[in-house]
């Protein structure tokens, strides 16, 4: 039985909200990073009977689910998050894990959270293993652009980079870059998502540019040295399976790619029973079983 509690990290600003699902003191400890718009509770409370975080804990993991700044119950301006902010937030979660558990720490994430989890594992030597539901080379996002509007808005955003000092706070709707109907397969889940009062539906121009359109502060993906498992749905339209095959082929570390047959984008919630064992098994293998 997993023990659940929530708390705030207040050692620095902004305050960060954590949701903990604890299995046992010696279980592998895994930090979870949510996707775009979302927060930790999105993966535990939004769909009745689909508590992904609890399921991971019941599979033998201690889960530290982080609300990135500007999201959920964490501090910071809504929709304001740079790549450097995200890496700092995750480092603070690792600090917490080391202070309260042990050093057998992994990281996992979904969608944008999978992308950020990959880079956090690459950059933070204390993270020993990763499972990423979706990845993307943030030095070059062009291979995954597929919506007609991408080919107008992405060049426009790049052109506005010199004006970030003036226009950086401009709110850009999530729908400009992400098609909501491609996230969930079930219409009722899409409705639940849209009704979630803690979700962020616009990001500042500076956020879009910092995370997706500024290659200079991103290390090459080939530098990854940790064992990493990549997960993707066979029919994911946002970050396709073929892209993940090419990404995995470039990695030099111990790696594994699992393409979930018949699945779309939202593996943690719409394919929970398939996803949880894939995540838990990797961490038990590379962080040690209880």
Outline where the language-model segments fall.
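Catalytic histidine-centered segment of alpha/beta-hydrolase-like enzymes
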Residues: 263-276
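N-terminal cap/lid segment of alpha/beta-hydrolase-fold proteins
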Residues: 1-23
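Alpha/beta-hydrolase-fold enzymes
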Residues: 112-197
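Catalytic nucleophile-loop/oxyanion-hole region of alpha/beta-hydrolase
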Residues: 72-104
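Conserved alpha/beta-hydrolase
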Residues: 51-75
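Short alpha-helix in the alpha/beta-hydrolase fold that links the catalytic acid
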Residues: 226, 240-249
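The serine-hydrolase catalytic nucleophile loop
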Residues: 36-51
